Amino acid sequence: MDINKLVLSQYIKSHPITSAKKYMRRNYFLTLQYLVASTEQQDLWSNKVMELYRRQWNQSDQREPYKSVGFITRMITGKYKFNLLLDALFISAFSNRKIGENLVDKFLLIYGKKYSEEVNMILSVFYNGYEDFFKTKIKELDKVLPILCKNRDFYNRMAKKVIITANMSAGKSTLLNALVGKNINKVQNMACTAKVHYIYNKSNEDDLIYEWDHDLELDATYEILMDDNHSNETSEIHVGTRFRSIFDVDEKVCFIDTPGVNFSRDESHKEIANTAIQTMECDLLIYLLNGENLCTEDDLEHLEFVHKNYKGPIIFLVNKMDTYRKGDDSISDTINKVISFLSEIGYADPKVYPISAYAAQLGKQAIFEGIEDEEDQDSLKTFHRKLKKPEFSYYTYYPNEVDISEYENREEYALLKNSGILHLEKMIYG
């Protein structure tokens, strides 16, 4: 499985055949099935994309043999034939141009050399992306080609890798869910296996979440995401989805979520997390601390390990200060305490900022999905009231500025700013 394909977006909802008549969808799917099978390159990705198409178009999974090339030609004619070629390239030959050229030869054998100019134009755009996009004047592909060009652009980019580490109960999974803008990670009260989660930002929003956890799911439900596949004997789970924020997140980013290192019932959590920190080449490390239980022996041990074994840039975040009360607790005093603690360990000029991961998660959920649970609604109202107070406006502790003036009348947007998540995202994505 080519892991990099997890950043590719599907375009099935923009596909013209989706709105075609039932018999045409059937003929199209059968012909596509034939073309994909003819490459003899079916892998996990191609099989799962074909399965996705079959489900979306309500097709049988039974293969039907073809008697002749002429039979195929009669099934798919007119405007859909170029979509057919693009689909076959996307499914079977995205990362292998030689296979793509063989597909083109087969296509021309079926439909005739008179389409050579258009077909070679499609091939050029498919593999060169935006570079050749404007050379293509095939109107039938107007909706699909921009998505494929964006896929190619994302696929070819170097990913920015951000590793996130913490002790248990710091709120790491909640922070990941807040950054991604979707519930893709287990929270602390769910049983977690010792796995490293890789979460990739996809090229476009296609309303699909991929998960590769021994098997590949291209439309992973919440239940699938929360239920680890016990057949997966590796220490990795990979997820692909389009990250959501109030600003477009158009960077190729991979968040690497390591297990909580002080999980007393399973020493492998610590071993896997430490190995990831020691061996992975990352652009940034985020260390999350629990503001309700700071400067513990567990934190001291892990922070010393990180200081010794990781030499890249680090952002330290203090979470769970939402229970602080004015007059009894101080955000600024807490931040200064953590800075002193880190300095004693040996960190030079540590960058420490407050965050409310839960407020950020609820804020994004309210914006993008809506909140039905009454307890979550109550928590959202509490966060609205508390975090708009000057002493609890976490964004004031960040060095950068985020302009949300166009959303100033929306409470949820103000909550995201006050929680610190928007400023953190700007530091991560640039």
Annotated model-derived regions:
Residues 1-168, 182-243, 309, 342-343, ...:
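N-terminal low-complexity/disordered regulatory or targeting extensions
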Residues 2-32, 347-430:
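C-terminal end of P-loop GTPase domains and the immediately downstream helical coupling element
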Residues 171-172:
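Conserved glycine(s) of the Walker
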Residues 198-244, 249-250, 258, 263, ...:
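Glycine-rich phosphate-binding loops of NTPases
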Residues 182-187, 248-270:
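Switch II (G3) loop of P-loop NTPases
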Residues 261-263, 280-300, 321-328:
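Conserved Switch II/interswitch segment of TRAFAC-class P-loop GTPases
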Residues 254, 283-289, 309-325, 333-361:
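Conserved beta-strand/loop subsegment of P-loop NTPase cores
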Residues 266-293, 306-312:
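Inter-motif core of Ras-like GTPase G domains
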